[in-house]
Regions:
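Non-catalytic interaction-recognition regions
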Residues: 1-276
């Protein structure tokens, strides 16, 4: 009645195409984007990674696409929670209370410089902190932005996982050639725990991939690094009193851990550093 254009098709809730002043809505532009992509790209599946609070909006978008046969592709909304400040309230760009990425990057680097002053390594560590901190929580849950917590080398952080893989890398670089010996096949508790956890990679990978929930793989990576650090602390490798057969076994365990962590780093978009 006031000049707005509403579809008369049987779609619930009704589709508002244009407002009374002639302007378009998010739904209108999203539908236009679907039509454009259908003509120019035509993918089998479209995944919208958007705030969970937009759930109803995307349900209506996808329902409209199906109703009008705008595309035969599948459409999925992967929602995520909010990043909150110390006041437990979500950061909002319109309120002007959000970190600029450049400022955030510099603040993290300042906290990490005590671990390594090399600029290239600092940049990688900073990106690791940002990536891992965002992937670790269940994407459906809100989390509090805490710079101190995210950069704690002893916490559940990107710094911690980088330190573990660097430790493994250094062990492999310092190994000596061992020949004419069989590998020891008796495993202590630390060795069994680490190997058992390594064997569970497929499960956590597909939990993340099939459900669009990377926190399964991120949490698994942290537990893997934590278990490796316990193994490292309790088991000597290169000491003279360690038999060659045991050295060989433990080197292979370290190699398996290092290879797997680098694979998971790649899955999560994290670049390993060479040193810390």
């Amino acid at each position: 009645d006031d000049g707005a254009l509403v579809s008369t098709e049987d779609v619930d809730p009704p589709i508002l195409i244009t407002k009374s002043d002639g302007s378009y809505l998010y739904l209108t532009t999203d539908l236009g984007t679907v039509v454009h992509r259908e003509k120019s790209q035509k993918y089998d599946k479209y995944i919208y990674v958007v705030d969970s609070r937009q759930k109803n909006h995307f349900e209506q978008v996808f329902k409209t696409v199906k109703h009008f046969n705008l595309s035969s592709s599948s459409f999925i909304h992967v929602g995520f929670g909010t990043v909150n400040g110390p006041d437990k309230k979500p950061f909002k760009t319109r309120d002007g209370n959000v970190y600029k990425l450049s400022k955030l990057h510099e603040d993290i680097k300042e906290k990490l410089i005590k671990y390594n002053e090399d600029e290239d390594i600092l940049n990688i560590l900073t990106n690791t902190v940002l990536t891992f901190s965002d992937l670790l929580p269940n994407r459906n849950q809100n989390y509090e932005f805490d710079l101190e917590k995210f950069t704690d080398i002893n916490g559940k952080t990107g710094v911690y996982i980088q330190y573990a893989q660097v430790r493994a890398r250094k062990l492999l670089e310092s190994k000596t050639e061992i020949v004419n010996t069989d590998i020891d096949t008796n495993f202590n508790l630390d060795e069994r725990r680490l190997l058992l956890l390594i064997s569970k990679f497929d499960y956590f990978y597909f939990q993340s991939f099939d459900n669009y929930q990377p926190h399964h793989l991120a949490d698994y990576l942290y537990n893997l690094c934590q278990t490796f650090n316990s193994f490292y602390a309790n088991n000597k490798i290169f000491s003279d009193d360690v038999p060659d057969s045991v050295k060989l076994k433990r080197i292979e365990i370290v190699n398996n851990f290092y290879t797997l962590t680098n694979l998971i780093f790649n899955c999560l978009g994290i670049q390993p550093v060479d040193s810390m």
